[in-house]
Swiss-Prot record:
GO terms for biological process: translation. The keyword Ligase does not apply. Keywords: Ribonucleoprotein, Ribosomal protein. InterPro entries: Ribosomal_bL33, Ribosomal_bL33_CS, Ribosomal_bL33_sf, Ribosomal_zn-bd. GO terms for cellular component: cytosolic large ribosomal subunit. This is Large ribosomal subunit protein bL33. The keyword Ribonucleoprotein applies. Coiled coil: none annotated. It comes from Idiomarina loihiensis (strain ATCC BAA-735 / DSM 15497 / L2-TR). The gene is rpmG. Gene3D superfamilies: Ribosomal protein L33 (2.20.28.120).
């Protein structure tokens, strides 16, 4: 079952990506390093719920 999630920047800019993940194979919270165009750097994005 794939659920939609939101990846929020840890730089505190409020920038986020939306994606989906398979909760059966990956039950823990996702953390991935991606580009944040507001600070123009690669930072860690953490999983949050889509409101």
């Amino acid at each position: 079952m794939r659920d939609k999630i939101r990846l929020v920047s840890s730089a505190g800019t409020g920038y986020f990506y939306t994606t989906d993940k398979n909760k059966r194979t990956m039950p823990e919270k996702m953390e991935i390093k991606k580009f944040d165009p507001v600070v123009r750097k690669h930072v860690i994005f953490k999983e949050a719920k889509i409101k």
